[in-house]
Every structure is written in C-alpha cells, then in structure tokens.
C-alpha cells in the first residue's frame, strides 16, 4: 500500500499563492471526487484508490492511498496538474511550492498537523476540528477506504494524546491575541476605538473575545446573515450590520478584523479610500485572517492604513516557543511511537490476503474430508475407524503443499524453507 501527503503550507508558499489553491469548505467533497477521477485517468493511476483534502488558511494538502506503485516526483506532478486544472492556474506557478511525503512520512505529517506541531501557531487547536471536517467530507464523497480511514482515526487519537499529556498549547500566542497586540502598537488604548469584525465564524468569535476583554468603545459584527451576526454580537454587547451596509459604515471604524469564507475580496481599494477620506485620514488598522483574502492587497499601500495578513502575524505567534520546546520534544516522541505502530498495522494488512487464502484452502480440504467421512458413516462403517481416516486425511492434505514445496526447492531456497517451516508449524526442531 502506497501512502502519500502532497501539498503546500505557510512555510513553503506565500498567502498570495495559498489563497489561489484554497478549497471552500462546501466544495471539499466535490474536490475529493474530482481528485480521484483525475488520478484515475492518468496513465499510471497512481494514488487513485483513496483521497482526502485538507484546506485551511495555512495549507492545502491531499492525502492519498493506493495499491498502485508510484514515485514521489510523479505524485507531485499529478497533484500540481490537478490543482492547476481545478483552480485554473499555470502548472509552473504551483510546482515549485509543493512537497510530497511518502509512507511513514505522510503518516507522521498527518499526526503532526492534527497535534498543532505544524501550525503557524504552535499547538493551536482549530486545526484538529478542520481536519475532522475534511475527513467527514472525504468520507461522504467516497474518498476514504480502509487505509485512510484507519490513518485518520489514529491521527485524531494521537492529537488527543499529545494535547492531554503535554503542554503543547500552553503559553501560545494565537492569531486573535496577536491582532490585539498589533493594534496596540497603532493605538494607545483600544478602549477609545471602534472595532468591526467581518464574518461570524470561529476565528471571528476568538478575535471578538480577545478584543472585548480590552473594552473597546464599540464592537460591531458585519455578516451576510444578519441573524447570525446579531447572535454573536449579543454575546459581546455589540451590534450587527449586513455586509451590504459596509461601504457606508466602514469610515466609522478604527480597527477592522476580517475572516470570511468568501472566494472574492469583500473590501476593495475604492471603499477604503472613501472611508479614509471621510475619516480625515485618521489611521485605520486592518487584519485580514481569510484565505482567500477578504481585503484587497493594494489597500496596504495607503498611507493611513495598517494592513496585516496571516503571514504578517507569523512573527508574533512565535512568542513563547522556547518555553514550549520541551513539550514539542514530548509530542514528537508520542507521535513517533504511534507512527511505528500504524506502519506495523499496514505491514500486517499486507498478509491478510495470504491468511484468507489459507483459510479458504483449509476449509475446502475440511469439507472434502468431512463429506467422505459422512458417506462412510452412512454405509455403517465403524465410527472410530472413520474418525481415524478423517484425521489422517486432513493431516495429509494440510502437509501436502509444504512438503511438495520443500521437495521441489533447491539450493538456498531449500535451506530457507527448511529453516522457515519449523517456525510456521512450531515443531521442536
């Protein structure tokens, strides 16, 4: 069985590329189905048996399993062509940024990702939920088989073990906390600022929690669905507005945090230019936590706008890394043990067909001898004599194959079989 993880993440590709290959959450199932069709129609049919796609703001990865052999470079090429075709991008733009991890390295990578060891925010918990969602969608799309299903179940168990037995998530600085710290570099006190959150998902909820603790002058949630926005805003004594109202109200806000699932930018250059003019060039602090990005990159060039992306926040979230190094070492040790256990399971799975054949062959021998014994009993033969014949017949049939193989073998092959057979049959020799 061939296992593989192919993708790009925040360490190999800039956000400008990651946003182009991100899959919206509601399209993951369709993407998995498309990936399996894509690999299946290739000449080698490499990695077409099982597939799952993980897509977050920091990574897009495809996990695959196949009985067909295939090289790492071939797998990278196939994945690059698939991503390029699916997202309508040039192949040459993607290929240099992709990595491929085969076999135990793929398993180790999945375990590390789910445990938060491969995240921009070391130990952050959101990635585990995102991976579980990705696996559910892959399963619904028919992408999971025996191997990926088992790998991901063990992945989730390892992540739980790491978080329960180490302090990997302790003292970490989250994206939400980093956003607050950055804003405090621009404004002396957040208590005098109006804060706007665009979106109503988990990341916005985390950010709102951190900013609300600073007692801002006002807190507003802008969302496509007003009811959902109002529900979140009520928790923080804020108010909600529709996204459609954003162009007219943007000028009222000093701090803007955006994280939606939109495939296109929500805030454009013209909108912000008009807002800055209405604010009489009072500074505006903006954080775009979305991938694809919610805020057009050109906005960052405006003199009175301080725009940060998820990559810009990377330096802040490394705070406390040295203090957590011991936890990282502990987590890596747990992961390594579980990787070896899973690879042993895969090796054991390789002999399952052989064991099944042995059972089927033995069952056929048993049925033949049993039928013969029944016929003898029906004729009135002595029961002890029939049982004796039955046992001898079964013994002869079971030993016929090994004896024939040993007699037909020559040289080193005979020596090898002669040493192996006593182990298989547990004889005294």
Curated annotation (Swiss-Prot):
Additional detail: During catalysis, the active site Cys acts as a nucleophile attacking the alpha-carbonyl group of tRNA-bound glutamate with the formation of a thioester intermediate between enzyme and glutamate, and the concomitant release of tRNA(Glu). The thioester intermediate is finally reduced by direct hydride transfer from NADPH, to form the product GSA.
EC number annotated for this UniProt entry: 1.2.1.70
Gene3D superfamilies (UniProt xref): Glutamyl-tRNA reductase, N-terminal domain, NAD(P)-binding Rossmann-like Domain
Active site: 57
SUPFAM superfamilies: Glutamyl tRNA-reductase catalytic, N-terminal domain, Glutamyl tRNA-reductase dimerization domain, NAD(P)-binding Rossmann-fold domains
Organism: Herminiimonas arsenicoxydans
Name of this chain's protein: Glutamyl-tRNA reductase
GO biological process: protoporphyrinogen IX biosynthetic process from glutamate
Function: Catalyzes the NADPH-dependent reduction of glutamyl-tRNA(Glu) to glutamate 1-semialdehyde (GSA).
GO molecular function, one term: NADP binding
Subunit structure: Homodimer.
Pathway info: Porphyrin-containing compound metabolism; protoporphyrin-IX biosynthesis; 5-aminolevulinate from L-glutamyl-tRNA(Glu): step 1/2
Keyword terms: NADP, Oxidoreductase, Porphyrin biosynthesis
Binding residue positions for substrate: 56-59, 119, 124-126, 130
Keyword NADP attributed: yes
Protein family per UniProt: Belongs to the glutamyl-tRNA reductase family.
Reaction catalysed by this enzyme: (S)-4-amino-5-oxopentanoate + tRNA(Glu) + NADP(+) = L-glutamyl-tRNA(Glu) + NADPH + H(+)
NCBIfam families: hemA
Annotated residues for binding of NADP(+): 199-204
Residues the record marks as site: Important for activity: 109
Superkingdom, taxonomy of origin: Bacteria
Listed PANTHER family: GLUTAMYL-TRNA REDUCTASE
Stored InterPro entries: 4pyrrol_synth_GluRdtase (IPR000343), 4pyrrol_synth_GluRdtase_dimer (IPR015896), 4pyrrol_synth_GluRdtase_N (IPR015895), GluRdtase_CS (IPR018214), GluRdtase_dimer_dom_sf (IPR036453), GluRdtase_N_sf (IPR036343), NAD(P)-bd_dom_sf (IPR036291), Shikm_DH/Glu-tRNA_Rdtase (IPR006151)
Keyword RNA-binding set for record: no
Domain notes: Possesses an unusual extended V-shaped dimeric structure with each monomer consisting of three distinct domains arranged along a curved 'spinal' alpha-helix. The N-terminal catalytic domain specifically recognizes the glutamate moiety of the substrate. The second domain is the NADPH-binding domain, and the third C-terminal domain is responsible for dimerization.
């Amino acid at each position: 069985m061939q296992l593989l993880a192919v993708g790009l993440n925040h360490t190999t590709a800039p956000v400008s590329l990651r946003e182009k290959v991100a899959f919206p959450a509601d399209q993951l199932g369709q993407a998995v189905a498309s990936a399996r069709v894509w690999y299946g129609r290739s000449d080698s049919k490499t990695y077409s048996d099982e597939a799952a796609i993980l897509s977050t703001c920091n990574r897009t990865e495809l996990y695959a399993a196949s009985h067909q052999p295939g090289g790492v470079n071939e797998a990278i090429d196939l994945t690059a062509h698939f991503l390029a075709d699916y997202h309508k991008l040039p192949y040459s733009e993607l290929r240099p940024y992709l990595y491929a991890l085969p076999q135990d390295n793929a398993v180790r990578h999945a375990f590390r990702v789910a445990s938060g060891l491969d995240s921009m925010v070391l130990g952050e918990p959101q990635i585990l939920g995102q991976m579980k969602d990705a696996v559910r969608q892959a399963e619904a799309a028919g992408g999971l088989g025996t191997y990926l299903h088992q790998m991901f179940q063990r992945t989730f168990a390892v992540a739980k073990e790491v978080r329960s037995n180490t302090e990997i998530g302790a003292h970490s600085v989250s994206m939400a906390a980093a956003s607050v710290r950055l804003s405090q570099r621009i404004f002396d006190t957040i208590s005098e600022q109006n804060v706007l959150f665009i979106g109503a998902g988990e990341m916005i909820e985390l950010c709102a929690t951190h900013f609300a603790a600073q007692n801002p002058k006002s807190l507003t949630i802008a969302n496509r669905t007003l009811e959902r926005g109002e529900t979140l805003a009520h928790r923080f004594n804020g108010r909600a507005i529709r996204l459609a109202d954003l162009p007219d109200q943007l000028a009222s806000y000093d701090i803007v945090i955006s994280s939606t699932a939109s495939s296109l930018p929500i805030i454009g250059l013209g909108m912000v230019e008009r807002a800055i003019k209405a604010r009489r060039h009072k500074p505006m602090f903006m954080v775009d936590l979305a991938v694809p990005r919610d805020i057009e990159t050109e906005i960052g060039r405006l003199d009175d706008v301080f725009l940060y992306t998820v990559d810009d926040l990377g330096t802040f979230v490394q705070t406390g890394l040295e203090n957590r190094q011991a936890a990282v070492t502990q987590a890596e040790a747990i992961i390594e043990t579980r990787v070896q256990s899973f690879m042993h399971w895969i090796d054991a799975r390789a002999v399952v067909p052989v064991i099944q054949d042995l059972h089927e062959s033995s069952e056929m021998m048993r049925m033949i001898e049993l039928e013969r014994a029944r016929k003898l009993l029906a004729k009135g033969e002595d029961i002890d004599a029939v049982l004796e014949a039955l046992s001898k017949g079964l013994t002869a049939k079971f030993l016929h194959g090994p004896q024939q193989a040993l007699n037909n073998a020559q040289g080193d092959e005979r020596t090898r079989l002669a040493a192996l057979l006593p182990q298989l049959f547990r004889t005294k020799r």
